[in-house]
């Protein structure tokens, strides 16, 4: 049978003894029903008794103290565990605490002759440090010893309960004893390695354990012997001493109490202090918050053990220490004592402002929830540094929790009890939250070695039913229950009294019935239902995938928050659920698949500036935060590669991050507020959306267009779902064989659009004299786009361009110089927006112009130009005025003194009139034909070039074919 640790023994035994020891039951009744009227506030000066089990403190009068001592003595004789302390008052007995380091692992003999010599030396210092009263007095010395040597350490207490001394006198006695050569010699003879420093200087005032009680996780000290010393002031040189006989016949809890004044053997002897009582310092009340926490919170005991596995750098180095503090604070506000204990493992830092730093960190953790490190990280660190010890502690922790239930409820286990242990076992791996439909939903953190779909590793996987927990209950949990069986049988094999053996027999019989339930399906379902409440982490679903810089990938989580991007392929606490199946590998232009794709991009988009701009734009699809308000309209007659490229982006990002959108979303009228729009909901949380293959002359709904492009919140709902609000985060591309019709003059809409027209066509038999005809390769559509190697390579290209955009353009697409797309966008706008065409052809910026035009004059000029060049129609002046105010002329319009709009700093040209010196057209110049724009490549590899208006690229050789 594997023995439980003493810590586990304490908690289990405390539970068991309440069942079979009538003395313990009587003690609890006394405390809860009769002595509760004497309860005090923690830290009260009136406190004289402290119950470490409950943390309660009492101010008991002498009569009630005697009753308590009687109950404690009966419990002690039955071997019950107790944790009671007495607070030393202004005048109380003397306790000397010796903490010994031994030369061997054998306990020192400490036989009566040596202890008698110690009594004499101690009394000499008592005489020298206090004023003993006149007359003859009996002074009793008791020696209690630590039950065993632990790693070369041992200890004993000297109790002189009848001699009532002031705290200052006790300190004086202890101070002089520390330098007593005779005492040091006696201890040295006993095999003590540290006789000069083994006496604890703080024993003069700290609360003292009542006899039979112990610190949590320690065995109580045992009485070795006692001596009676007789002192007569009339003959101070004659001090007889003899060993006390029949010492066990007395109530030892009462007799060894430092504050009791009504003992049968020990009578009080009051000594005058050498320092006035009014100058006495306060007697402290020891802080037992950590002990109480660990006694009542199994998880705290468990964490205490786990923290002990962390190497020194975790409490010495500030970054690691602060992470531990944050993890404890984020796990539970009650774990502050654990944080203090862990911080004190480095005394140098704790004593130089450590407490203040801890206070600040603890408060920061409650305010800054973005640093969501929890106990899961502590578990990971401990397992990393001490895997074998970690495994043993974890297994022991499960055993302790289950054992408490078994002993508390006489072996009968119900659903919640099993669920509680399962939570301790799997609480770091599973989380439950309630979804928008009010249903409990399970999530499992997927680790290597589990059955999984590609991409689920190191992420939170949604489970319809936690099948692993069902299996775990029957297979793994049964092993923990077997340990309980061993534990009970071990006690049955011990020489206990009949009533205790009968208790264990009944316990084993009931427990064996409970064990069989874990193989029952309906019972396990009940356990899972109860586990839902324990595993519940409120708002967990809302926190999933909220960091736009984190992308779930096939081999972990990719962080693009820093440059270069960082692959997280180990334990982490980022709440990531979504993912793409693509594995991230760093960009390598020498990779054959990367070369293939770089060449393909060069063929699809022949203009270098346009190719770079489009790749920068598409790279923003891996970021799911707010972006620049842009949409790319891509025109092409077919067989030009645009569909391949758009689909490849979508396939690489996967359905969680990308979506193909129905073109009706852009062309149809907006639905009414109460109606669902599943197509629009496809954009929620997506980083990329694309439209393709429209009919001829599709008219875009400009209000929907602006809503989709503008950054900010939108609302929509799925069928049979509630209305939701979400942010538009998608990088959007709309491709068509025909130009879209955009019937608006609103500059706010047009400035969000970019237009590119494909020039290249992939043919079966390309014309060798036409540089825009390329040899088609069906493998791109039918094979490469589905090949994981191709997809991985393209994803690395997207990440490369994202990093390049951040480094060189501060992440802003509008800073990327691209004359091709600018001129094509301008030409496209002119073909759609006649008002803009008029402005860019007939109105020029003229800083020296003295003419100021009323807005009505501009309206008239436009109407005349329209009727002469477009079509004769009736124009509504008010509508035209509003359109001009929202056009590219907006920045040139001013308010006149009479509150009318005027055009200033510009000149309206007459037909065939040319520019004057210093004048320039408004808008982008489109001089020259777009088809004749030279294809100009840089000497270096094209993907390395950074568009710069002041440095045109030089001719470059294309990337080599793999």
Curated annotation (Swiss-Prot):
Xref: InterPro entries: AEP_C962R, Helicase_SF3_DNA-vir, P-loop_NTPase, Phage/plasmid_primase_P4_C, PriCT_2, Viral_Helicase-Primase_Cplx
Organism: African swine fever virus (isolate Warthog/Namibia/Wart80/1980) (ASFV)
Record EC number: 3.6.4.-
Name assigned to this protein: Putative primase C962R
One term of GO molecular function: ATP binding
Domain SF3 helicase: 607-775
GO biological process: DNA replication
Domain of life: Viruses
Cross-referenced Gene3D superfamilies: P-loop containing nucleotide triphosphate hydrolases
Family classification: Belongs to the asfivirus helicase C962R family.
Highest classification ranks of the organism: Viruses, Varidnaviria, Bamfordvirae, Nucleocytoviricota, Pokkesviricetes
